Amino acid sequence: MSKAYEQSGVNIHAGYEAVERMSSHVKRTMRKEVIGGLGGFGATFDLSQLNMTAPVLVSGTDGVGTKLKLAIDYGKHDSIGIDAVAMCVNDILTTGAEPLYFLDYIATNKVVPEVIEQIVKGISDACVETNTALIGGETAEMGEMYHEGEYDVAGFAVGAVEKDDYVDGSEVKEGQVVIGLASSGIHSNGYSLVRKLINESGIDLASNFDNRPFIDVFLEPTKLYVKPVLALKKEVSIKAMNHITGGGFYENIPRALPAGYAARIDTTSFPTPKIFDWLQQQGNIDTNEMYNIFNMGIGYTVIVDEKDASRALKILAEQNVEAYQIGHIVKNESTAIELLGV
């Protein structure tokens, strides 16, 4: 075989090895609706087996952002795969959709099979937890596009929901309750600022913070909310949901509210992880701005009728999710979110 391609910076054999290494991880994620296996030009999924009357497909795509830089610098690659899945499936979950399948895209300076395997293992772990088939993907070696050791990861998720069960916020009314589901930490947003503060502080990321190495705190993967929220949806009528990502409370909570309504949030009603206090102090950041950047301890919200709030909290507790009644819906023509206690 000609070495011309390899001399241009593309190692075909490393790509083959990466595929071989990832195959066992991918197989763990398969669902009965998946038709065929890996290696085809297009991945296929049989919707007729879902037993839905009028399925609506919901799709989403996202990446992990500059959190990748920390993972690359410290050689911790598996948790990044979890982040890639979580950012996508949590987004489509806000419509009430059950995630069905996921595709990944990994672009890198040079294919290192061991690193690709770690990333795909994390992706597969998250797919197994959320019953999402890893149905396809692409690994691209682009030496001229990335510095040595660098890579980027993006994901694409597709789910389905019965048309009559689609959650779009149109039933939000005054007096309904906002329930917040605890985050696992910073999740995958705000890392350009996080990395800046890390560099300015000069901290040793191997040193401990709150009984854990700093690096483990910063790379804690985004929490997956699929199982608990779908369990809740079976028992309680959910009026709206939000995934608290980039833009924090201020940008994300209003996205599911009809015009003329606001979520009045009591910021003293839930605990804020200590890492946010560290970031705020290190950067001398205004509290309002913190809520405009980070999740501040709440990674996902659901809005339910007041009569269903206690039951919803009980169901979430049974799903081993920390959840809090953090606010309620009010009429407000001028703003869609009111934060109390900041």
UniProtKB/Swiss-Prot annotation:
EC numbers: 6.3.3.1
Cross-referenced Pfam families: AIRS (PF00586), AIRS_C (PF02769)
Keywords: ATP-binding, Cytoplasm, Ligase, Nucleotide-binding, Purine biosynthesis
Pathway field: Purine metabolism; IMP biosynthesis via de novo pathway; 5-amino-1-(5-phospho-D-ribosyl)imidazole from N(2)-formyl-N(1)-(5-phospho-D-ribosyl)glycinamide: step 2/2
UniProt keyword Magnesium present: no
Disulfide-linked positions: none
SUPFAM superfamilies, A to Z: PurM C-terminal domain-like, PurM N-terminal domain-like
This protein's record includes keyword Iron: no
Cellular localisation: Cytoplasm
GO molecular function: ATP binding; phosphoribosylamine-glycine ligase activity; phosphoribosylformylglycinamidine cyclo-ligase activity
GO BP terms: 'de novo' IMP biosynthetic process; adenine biosynthetic process
Catalysed conversion reaction: 2-formamido-N(1)-(5-O-phospho-beta-D-ribosyl)acetamidine + ATP = 5-amino-1-(5-phospho-beta-D-ribosyl)imidazole + ADP + phosphate + H(+)
Subcellular location, principal: cytoplasm
One term under GO cellular component: cytosol
NCBIfam families (alphabetical): purM
Entry similarity comment: Belongs to the AIR synthase family.
Full protein name: Phosphoribosylformylglycinamidine cyclo-ligase
Protein's organism: Staphylococcus aureus (strain JH9)
Name of the gene encoding the protein in the UniProt record: purM
